[in-house]
């Protein structure tokens, strides 16, 4: 436990109040919040709290794969602390090997004896001036990836190569992964390489960003390729196919891609084309601004949260288009790349391309994003933060034997109770507020959140984006429910730019928050620039 957290808990125990100020009486509230656990809705897929790793910069090599002979504590070459922390948040899935890397990756290069694997070309490292892995060692292949998934307890999500691969290569990879022992020659080869039992990979991405790095196609052109790749696939495990979707952060939301792809599938009759998931990417993209991940002012704080919140509209827009072609909505959204993307300048080192400082702002952005995903549980099968370690909106930073959790990690930890819960209605009695942006102004919810129920426990998560004002809430459970007890944690810091470093790894960590209960009502004070998670146990 960090000294800061220990001191806080001692203070809270001694005074009976939160360190952010004494609670007002239950009847004196800034916001009335009503939650109705008697009206459970769709289940929140655990997979919306998913992860993404790629052969880029320090993500796989050094971040995760340190090598079997490394002095860094490891399990068969995989960083031990990474495994432990991923287990702690119940990481439900891992997407690999890309990203753009996937459409240049040929899976056979990553199997067999490590010393005999070919050294191959990594286009994305080569095109980066400071990339150090332009020559891909292939030390981390499908067997190492599956070992990582088993250690963590995560389900594999494999992105296949459409951009430079073939349907045959894809089908062989599926067979290599999933064919039972003693059936195909590919199953024998897998066993000879150390894994007799099948990997049982269910989730398969059919390419990645095929509108760009994955082939520079139109939606209609990709529809043709998609049909080829999923035809005559080996079905040892019923696959969940994820088709390449739009670049949702583009100016128009890239709605033309969605229309073109589903329209292209409609032109084919009688082939039974199945699309289980549709991959929407949404980056809160600030690469063209003067600010970076560490240096920002009030306008920069609000601009990132405001643009991040726009993902909700993008989800609704593409869902509506999908519904025109698929009225029953058999195809679900898979938001397999999301997160903040700043201009360079705060990398861990020149070779750690696309790494960036992760601050309290990024933790709140993640919280608001998760609440959007929860509220649209009927639409979203999976989501994957980009990326889990040493890249963009990362949960961890690692360089050699130095390692830390970022503030964003704790958002995942605090939201874990939502996984597999059923969404319940939550009404927050606060209007939106006007906030300054980098250009002009915009509107943000004064308080945003979501709620879920599981057994006799209700989880509510709330984010206060204000840099100035705390919010005192009175939370009432509707439907005749009564509270037995409540427990709450808060993630905040007096400095909006606060981050965790190798030297100060516990600067931004969750702390206990007072949550007094009376009958069907609880009180929470949400500090400024904070995210709160509360669990209410029903009588």
Regions found by a protein language model. Name each.
Residues 280:
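Histidine-centered catalytic micro-motifs
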Residues 284-302:
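Active-site His/acidic residue clusters
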Residues 306-307:
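Beta-strand-rich domain onsets/edges
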Residues 1-3, 14:
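N-terminal secretory signal peptides
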Residues 9-21, 26-277, 311-312, 316-344, ...:
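Non-catalytic accessory regions flanking glycosidase/transglycosidase catalytic cores in CAZymes
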